[in-house]
Structure formats: structure tokens, C-alpha cells
Amino acid sequence: MKTFNYESNCVKYKNCFFDVGEYEKGKLSLAIYGCVEDDENVSHISNATVNVEEKLEENEVVIDNYANTNLISFLLDLGIVKSIPKKVTVKFLRLPVVELDLDKLYEYSYEQEVLKYAS
């Protein structure tokens, strides 16, 4: 599993990875985990996505860029986000729907690491 360094709200994290899960109706959910600067303990950093009622493609998610202001540009730099096809309204906020490169996402995913050792 590849890891990355991430900075959010003036806090630096290292050895970060995505936990890829699913919301109730099968839509992808992403959470970021990693270590705060010099700490070796892994902790939850942020939920990156928001569950919505709108129909999304299998490789689309809604990014919570209100809580994670630099996340989309960061995901673009990693090659995980391919495009931003539209926006949706969630609790009075206009949030972007992004198209993901799932192969690239899974390179940084805890789930992929578990599957590798399970086979």
C-alpha cells in the first residue's frame, strides 16, 4: 500500500491512507487515516466524502471540501480525481461530485492492503 503525507488545518500528517467503504445504498465512502507528525499511532483524520440521495456513477463521490478545503487539489495531484462533473447541494452547501480513478485510489487504500494479504 502506498501512503502519502497530508496537511489539514495547519496539522501535518504522515503515512496516510484511505479507508474505502460504502454508504447504505452502495455509494463509496472515503476516510483518511494517518499519523500526526511525530506520533506513530494511526488515527482518523477526516471523512472525505458525504452521503447524498442523488444518483452517482460507481466511481463518483461527493467531497466534503467545506471541512477539507484543500482536499480536491490534493486528490488531483495524487491522480485520484479525474474530473469534477457537477456539484450537488448538501445542507445548504454546494459540494463537488468528483470522478475517481479507482485503480489509483486503491493503491492508497487500506482495503487493498488487507485483500493482498488475504489471498
Residue ranges and their predicted role:
Residues 22-41, 85-89:
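Short, flexible beta-strand-to-coil junctions
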Residues 64-116:
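Short, compact, well-ordered microdomains
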Residues 4-6, 11, 54, 61, ...:
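Hydrophobic transmembrane signal anchors and adjacent membrane-proximal interface regions, especially
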Residues 31-80:
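Acidic, aromatic-enriched beta-alpha/helix-loop junctions
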Residues 1, 115-119:
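Short intrinsically disordered terminal tails
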